[in-house]
Amino acid sequence: MLRRVGRTTCSPAACQLRHTTILSVRKGDTVVLLGDRQVTLGERIVAKSSACKLRRINDDVVIGFAGSTADAISLMEKLENKIGEFPNQLTRAAVELAKEWRTDRALRRLEASLIVCSAEETLEIDGQGNVITPEADGIVAIGSGGTFAKAAARALIDVDGYDAEKIARKAMRIATDIDVFSNEHWDVEVLKRKSEKQEGSEASAKTSE
């Protein structure tokens, strides 16, 4: 487990880092990623539903970000390139991005955190360039409402009849009710792990082509 190191000073971009809620919940064969759409500048809310903080790289990977939008987009583009270099190796791609983030003088100035999900893996890449795997419960959250969202999701994870999406939506509702820098306008991405039968069918289809 990696300890996050707080900064003693805070640039506008770094301050933005906490002004949102991004939550990922994994249960069974499903992983869900939610992000609110509120935009803040410093301590001022400038838009309540205009910013999509989730991005689907391809059919297999989705990313949520907290922080400066421009910085996050730069990092997501870098990660997309790494995923292209290391297909089906999400952890390897994330680690390679983290190495570059730590060593490149320009990248070191970028202020953002990412949650990256595939059907098989969930990772957090923090503002220090660390790659962090979630606890055994598969729940990850970042942003100012992240602590509330994570706590709520953990309380709901074992409730009978609650699938990953229902848990995530309920936890997100609780978090955004508490956190003034997050709101009830969300984007949602869902990925499902393919069964062996589905993978076999797809492989057969490709072979026949």
Swiss-Prot record:
The active site is at T20. It is found in: Mitochondrion matrix, Kinetoplast. The keyword Ribosomal protein does not apply. Keywords: Hydrolase, Kinetoplast, Mitochondrion, Protease, Threonine protease, Transit peptide. Its EC number is 3.4.25.2. Residues 1-19 form a transit peptide. One of its GO terms (cellular component) is proteasome core complex. One of its GO terms (biological process) is rolling circle DNA replication. It comes from the Eukaryota. The keyword Membrane does not apply. Gene3D superfamilies: Glutamine Phosphoribosylpyrophosphate, subunit 1, domain 1. One of its GO terms (molecular function) is ATP-dependent peptidase activity. It catalyses: ATP-dependent cleavage of peptide bonds with broad specificity. SUPFAM superfamilies: N-terminal nucleophile aminohydrolases (Ntn hydrolases). It holds the Pfam family Proteasome. A double ring-shaped homohexamer of HslV is capped on each side by a ring-shaped HslU homohexamer. The assembly of the HslU/HslV complex (HslVU) is dependent on binding of ATP. Protease subunit of a proteasome-like degradation complex. HslU recognizes protein substrates and unfolds these before guiding them to HslV for hydrolysis. HslV is not believed to degrade folded proteins. The HslVU protease complex functions in mitochondrial DNA replication by regulating DNA helicase PIF2 protein levels. PANTHER family: ATP-DEPENDENT PROTEASE SUBUNIT HSLV, METALLOPROTEASE TLDD. Belongs to the peptidase T1B family. HslV subfamily. This is ATP-dependent protease subunit HslV. The lineage of its organism: Eukaryota, Discoba, Euglenozoa, Kinetoplastea, Metakinetoplastina. The gene is HslV.
